[in-house]
Amino acid sequence: EKTRDKVLYGNVDQECTGIVTSCWASVDVIKYVIEKGANLIISHEALFWNHGDHQEWLEESKNSVYLEKRKLLDDHQIVVWRDHDYIHSGIPYKGDYIDGIFLGLAKKMGWEDKLIVNPINEFDPSLLCSTAYSFDHSIKAKDLAKELIDTCHLNGIKLIGNSNADIKKAAVLFHVFGDANEAIKNTDKSDVDCLLSMELIDFTYAEYLRDSGMLGRNRVALGMGHFNLEEPGMEYMLE
């Protein structure tokens, strides 16, 4: 498949009564849509918990959660459209193109004028980078964590590494599912003080950061989680 952007569920020929955007079309999001009288969910991620949103295996196993979630969609004639690649691939911004998801994060945090090139993760060179930030003044790791919690309305953040680090530069750390060799090498060579992490495996990158902190390195990861980092981008999509 060339794109992940497609209708995941429902009848698109019906009249649209309202639109809700979300990072993921969870059961609670579906219930919210029903309550508001809407019938179109624009979701950033897949609907049924797998890459490609395949449903055959769930049908064959008669998965009870799948069947109940599907019934909720059917009973209220809800359509789910996935918008993943488009908003990541570049939207017009100040005469250039920028990743819309992470522009949303920068806007929410007031970091639009602080964007720099991300030295940890390779990024599409055709896009204006929107995944790393340089601050005018240093900020303590704990204070930055609190700012993220308050602004993004989070229940908490996992802090890994030197909790007393002074943050001048921060960067989004993309998916670390297991092998973190490249991310560790790039981090060690960089002057980034804080990593805003999506998925983070304890036995590789997280342990590297813990050891860094124990050796007094000025570096920390703030584990926000995948959806918490990308949700501001789906909020920005409404604009």
Where are these predicted regions, by residue range?
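Active-site catalytic microenvironments in core metabolic enzymes, especially phosphate/sugar-handling
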Residues: 1-239
